[in-house]
Amino acid sequence: MVKRNQRKKSAPKKRLTKAEVEKQRAIKRMILSVLMALLLIFAMLRLGVFGVTTYNMIRFLVGSLAYPFMFAWLIYLFCFKWLRQKDGMIAGVVIAFLGLLVEWHAFLFAMPRMLDQDIFLGTARLITRDLLALRVTEFVGGGMLGALLYKPIAFLFSNIGSYFIGFLFILLGLFLMTPWDIYDVSHFVKEAVDKLAVAYQENKEKRFIKREEHRLQAEKEALEKQAQEEEKRLAELTVDPETGEIVEDSQSQVSYDLAEDMTKEPEILAYDSHLKDDEASLFDQEDLAYAHEEIGAYDSLSALASSEDEMDMDEPVEVDFTPKTHLLYKLPTIDLFAPDKPKNQSKEKNLVRKNIKVLEDTFQSFGIDVKVERAEIGPSVTKYEIKPAVGVRVNRISNLADDLALALAAKDVRIEAPIPGKSLIGIEVPNSEIATVSFRELWEQSDANPENLLEVPLGKAVNGNARSFNLARMPHLLVAGSTGSGKSVAVNGIISSILMKARPDQVKFMMIDPKMVELSVYNDIPHLLIPVVTNPRKASKALQKVVDEMENRYELFSKIGVRNIAGYNTKVEEFNASSEQKQIPLTLIVVIVDELADLMMVASKEVEDAIIRLGQKARAAGIHMILATQRPSVDVISGLIKANVPSRMAFAVSSGTDSRTILDENGAEKLLGRGDMLFKPIDENHPVRLQGSFISDDDVERIVNFIKDQAEADYDDAFDPGEVSDNDPGFSGNGGAAEGDPLFEEAKALVLETQKASASMIQRRLSVGFNRATRLMDELEEAGVIGPAEGTKPRKVLQTN
């Protein structure tokens, strides 16, 4: 019995669980917090000797800031869990409080009675006097802690400089307490500067318009006064009562002036983008009609050629120099678009700090030593830039995309290994809330040059900067992505950007829209060469018309002696400056195909040939293409098309195969499908992730209606594809003829030479589609060259070579 009791006494105590230990700590923390709160309350209320003494002891530490110090301490005791979740809140309060201590102590030692006293001894003497007398009467500045901070600052910067240092501490503390970071502040400052610049430019334009109105009004009054004087002078002339003729000598002078005016060359009105619609009333009726009069065509180019090299022209090139629009044209303004809505990404900033810890822990669990250098919050994704340790292979990190997505609870993760131009690896994680980038916001923040008519703001990068591209440098663009990924919105944004900068006599469009709903809103704008083409059979002919225009322009360039459209237009300007006969510069042409796959199904051979020829030669002629498709497969985007359309824009696709078809690399399958894209221009080896701008249908209709009010559409018959029918020879599913295939003789010669007949051989040797090859086999059978099909056996060749 004794042994059993001894065994029980010597048994080890049961170890507490982690939850029980945490519970005991919480109880101790609560008891300590309550006791500390009671102590602070007694001190704040100065209850009795204990309260006054405690208050003076706190004053000894922080001086006359004892009340704010105790109040902040009480908040920390009961809200410390909430404060720990707010990163930077505690540090901000501490730094701001230190700044206040410096300010209070600088104020104390600016008093006359403290000027000659030692900082530490003078402060201690004031506090000790109240402490021993059990009273609170003296202003003691920032206490001993304030004296400790103030002494070196006052020694280095003087008493006045201490005020500035303390103020900087307070500003820094307030900045840390807010959810903003330095990038938000710089972005806010940049936006404020941009808005001030825009307001200044608008005021400058308004002042210019007012000056022009006053000038035009003065000219009008002067002309009216001159006309009245002339009418009065003519009324005073002597008229022969028999013949009714003027017998004064002024008759000859008047006749001479009229004759001189009739032979004078019309003056081309200079374009003024500030001219308002209501200013037309400032012109006389004759002047207004004269300003809207179209300039006559200058048929022969011999004068221009002789002014340069006096070269001979064997055959005159027919080029229409007649302007198709009136010269009084006002460009649209950004006010036509809906204003930008405010965005709040403070939630993302709190999430970023958490994700940085998760990323480092996840890599550590896989035995990879990395450090997150920085994080950039974009509109749709946040990019974490990590630096691997020496000896860590890049593919070890890139292979962890799925594991990182699991750890971060993200939809998908895209890894950019490495970031071009940096010794870092980028990890792009989708944001919890996508911030929409409006077209107006992107336009106002972009730094596009208004002189570059084809420079278009495309979207925002991950760092929040607006990115623009110049279609003239691309020189052609392929846009591909699945349905609903933002492809059509991006095309509308490109068109709207060009319409915002270019007049109809500067840029022309040819739009091809087999779906009949995407681009039909642009019908009847003056920038169109022909109405929007919706018939796929007409589209191939329309593209051929553009090819013919390209050839005509090159023939013109060769005879004038220039290499591109810029050189030709420069020659025209020089010729117009020295000659009374004016010529019109050539316009840029932008060809937009909204659904390339539909055209390739109807007339693949003709469409592909036209696209390839334009891709090879059209840049110097001022012709550029934008090809869009929602089926990025190799039978739509062939190798020749990709070789001649070097700039690519990939939206979200379903597989890595489609991404490789567009960009020649993976990545587009990781996109969100919310207007984000991978843009790979001609001058970059790696794609750039951008968040495209959103432009609503209402915005498009407003800008289209504004342009239609400026001028009417004047289509060019030279680009009209004419009428086509379903039985039109030359159109078939693969580009072959419906009857009497032109490759029949070649196919017959091939079969007779090889004494073999199969659709696959014809398809391979003649480079045709399978459907066309089977039709050629049927024609060979009807012509008696080969026998009928016998199941799996090869066909017999009935003729010999």
From Swiss-Prot:
SUPFAM superfamilies (UniProt xref): P-loop containing nucleoside triphosphate hydrolases (SSF52540), Winged helix' DNA-binding domain (SSF46785)
Can you give the residue ranges of the FtsK domain?
A: 464-660
Q: Where in the cell is it found?
A: Cell membrane
Name one process (GO BP) from the record: cell division
What sections of the protein cross the membrane? 31-53, 58-80, 89-111, 131-150, 155-177
This molecule's function is given as: Essential cell division protein that coordinates cell division and chromosome segregation. The N-terminus is involved in assembly of the cell-division machinery. The C-terminus functions as a DNA motor that moves dsDNA in an ATP-dependent manner towards the difSL recombination site, which is located within the replication terminus region. Required for activation of the XerS recombinase, allowing activation of chromosome unlinking by recombination.
* Similarity remark: Belongs to the FtsK/SpoIIIE/SftA family.
Q: What is this protein called?
A: DNA translocase FtsK
Source organism per entry reads Streptococcus pyogenes serotype M6 (strain ATCC BAA-946 / MGAS10394)
